[in-house]
Amino acid sequence: MVISKERGIYTQINSEKVATGSFYTEKATWLTSPVDKFLRFAFSEGAKIALDPYAGNGHLLQLIEQKYDIPSVGFDIKGFNGNFNDSLINIPIIDDAIIITNPPYLTNYSAKRKRVFYNVSKYFELGYEDLYQVALSCCLKSARFTVAIVPETFINSTFDK
């Protein structure tokens, strides 16, 4: 991938990881006091299972199981515990689930610049600018409660908040 053509700077990329917008969450820094309060509220309102439709290696689910002692299920486009699913197209509906996820991130522009747009073009047909927006739309249609790690650019995005 070209970083700076003028300066001759290039870097190798993992095109599979880039094309799926994968960024794995391995620490609990996202589990802030307001998030904990929201999770406890969701559990008190009937959420009984944690669902991560973009599970990756499952670190979010492991943390939720340990901290809140609830069962979990995860899906991933590359498979998670044998559960394969393209959740940018459809998230399986699970009764009483709360979605807790770090959705994929990849802008339309970045996909073109990194030459992986052909892998993800179908997701941008809905008119969103970033895969995380596609993911959020799917999450909000699939569960009553959703906790999603999103980039700061979300605040200024055109996504309907």
Description of each model-found segment:
Residues 1-52, 60-63:
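S-adenosyl-L-methionine
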Residues 47, 95-96, 142-143:
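Short, well-ordered alpha-helix to beta-strand connector turns
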Residues 51-53, 69-76, 148:
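Short, hydrophobic beta-strand segments that form beta-sheet elements in well-ordered domains
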Residues 56:
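Conserved glycine-rich SAM-binding loop
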Residues 73-94, 98:
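Adenosine-cofactor binding site in Rossmann-like domains, unifying the SAM/SAH pocket
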Residues 99-113:
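Short, solvent-exposed beta-strand-terminating loops
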Residues 109-127:
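Mobile active-site "lid"/loop adjacent to the S-adenosyl-L-methionine
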Residues 127-161:
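Conserved Class I SAM-dependent methyltransferase catalytic core
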